[in-house]
Amino acid sequence: MTQLKYLLLVSRQGKIRLKKWYTAMSAGEKAKIVKDLTPTILARKPKMCNIIEYNDHKVVYKRYASLYFIVGMTPDVDNELLTLEIIHRFVETMDTYFGNVCELDIIFNFSKVYDILNEMIMCDGSIAESSRKEVLHHVTVMDTMESNDNLERVLS
């Protein structure tokens, strides 16, 4: 079973576009992880391995367009290839939802990105749902409920 510690989306310029922490850490520890990993991963060449060791855990990353998807995972328990597949499934799901997702979609619709992520990965870092179709169905239902709620507020 995969147990994620965190997920970061970082632009090629080193700006954090999204971050989600699945284990309890102090603000200092979180800042140190971001400060250490961002330049390390941005400096790596495209042909280098996507898996690196960092302190007490492993880091798996994958670049899609101008964004790096960085995941911290528990060592010896998790499968690095499964973690890469989780990243890929997350990107595919966003691609389907937004229609060819780009960095601007993530910036301006970050709440929807968090909704998709929360449908896929539970708050403890384990996989909740791997089916893209199911995740999209749940997010679409949430969208419908939100739009109905907003309509009722406007009309009342």
From Swiss-Prot:
The lineage of its organism: Eukaryota, Fungi, Dikarya, Ascomycota, Saccharomycotina. GO terms for molecular function: clathrin adaptor activity. One of its GO terms (cellular component) is intracellular membrane-bounded organelle. This is AP-1 complex subunit sigma-1. Keywords: Cytoplasm, Cytoplasmic vesicle, Endosome, Golgi apparatus, Membrane, Nucleus, Protein transport, Transport. It comes from Saccharomyces cerevisiae (strain ATCC 204508 / S288c). Component of the adapter complexes which link clathrin to receptors in coated vesicles. Clathrin-associated protein complexes are believed to interact with the cytoplasmic tails of membrane proteins, leading to their selection and concentration. AP19 is probably a subunit of the Golgi membrane adapter. Component of the AP-1-related (AP-1R) complex, an adapter protein complex that mediates sorting of cargo SNARE SNC1. In contrast to the APM1-containing AP-1 complex, AP-1R is incapable of sorting CHS3. Adapter protein complex 1 (AP-1) is a heterotetramer composed of two large adaptins (gamma-type subunit APL4 and beta-type subunit APL2), a medium adaptin (mu-type subunit APM1) and a small adaptin (sigma-type subunit APS1). AP-1 interacts with clathrin. Also a component of the AP-1R complex composed of at least APM2, APL4 and APS1. It is found in: Cytoplasm; Nucleus; Cytoplasmic vesicle, Clathrin-coated vesicle membrane; Endosome. One of its GO terms (biological process) is vesicle targeting, trans-Golgi to endosome. Belongs to the adaptor complexes small subunit family. Present with 6370 molecules/cell in log phase SD medium.
